[in-house]
Amino acid sequence: MDMQSRIRRLFQASIDTKQQAMDILAPHIEQASLVMVNALLNEGKMLACGNGGSAGDAQHFSSELLNRFERERPSLPAIALTTDSSTLTSIANDYSYNEVFSKQIRALGQPGDVLLAISTSGNSANVIQAIQAAHDREMIVVALTGRDGGGMASLLLPEDVEIRVPSTVTARIQEVHLLAIHCLCDLIDSQLFGSEE
């Protein structure tokens, strides 16, 4: 297969996954946005975590809220738990890598805050511990997962929201996660500041 055919095949696979996900995920993304807006209206904040590409997604989400998405508006409180190398490495060194997010949540999380927990497999041990810590702090969890939802799905409470991408391919799951994050940012802005359409 020549390179351009391979590129087209990858584009088509991404399109197909997004089309399949659109109807399945729309109600879950809507519900997640309502949870997040309710938290923000009640002086709550967003905390976000994940590993690797999912860490990048956590940072992307937090930066879109803190700075801006597609319009000028006041900053919204959001913290990516993936960015402080001193904190991450001290926890990993002194305790365990599995606790790098949960210890931060126990310090920063408050009742009514929301945790955006991101894992393509749903089985990242440190994200699973983050969910447990969030529940201990009476936070609501929005989980971005893929495959069968993994261990994260089994931990979710009725008030939590899972956005599970219908794919087993990591790259396709990550692509839909980013789109879901952009949808969340758009819905948060439109609910808090009015629709621009």
From Swiss-Prot:
Q: Which molecular function GO terms apply here?
A: carbohydrate derivative binding; D-sedoheptulose 7-phosphate isomerase activity; zinc ion binding
Q: Fetch the InterPro entries from UniProt.
A: GmhA/DiaA (IPR035461), Phosphoheptose_Isoase (IPR004515), SIS_dom (IPR001347), SIS_dom_sf (IPR046348), SIS_GmhA/DiaA_subfam (IPR050099)
- Keyword Zinc present in the record's keywords: the answer is yes
Q: Name one GO biological process term.
A: carbohydrate metabolic process
Q: Where in the cell is it found?
A: Cytoplasm
Protein's pathway: Carbohydrate biosynthesis; D-glycero-D-manno-heptose 7-phosphate biosynthesis; D-glycero-alpha-D-manno-heptose 7-phosphate and D-glycero-beta-D-manno-heptose 7-phosphate from sedoheptulose 7-phosphate: step 1/1
Fetch the CDD domains from UniProt. Answer: SIS_GmhA (cd05006)
Q: Does the keyword Kinase feature in the UniProt annotation?
A: no
Predominant localisation class: cytoplasm
Q: Where is the SIS domain?
A: 36-197
Disulphide bonds in the chain: none
Q: What does this protein do?
A: Catalyzes the isomerization of sedoheptulose 7-phosphate in D-glycero-D-manno-heptose 7-phosphate.
Q: Which protein family is named in the record?
A: Belongs to the SIS family. GmhA subfamily.
Q: What is this protein called?
A: Phosphoheptose isomerase
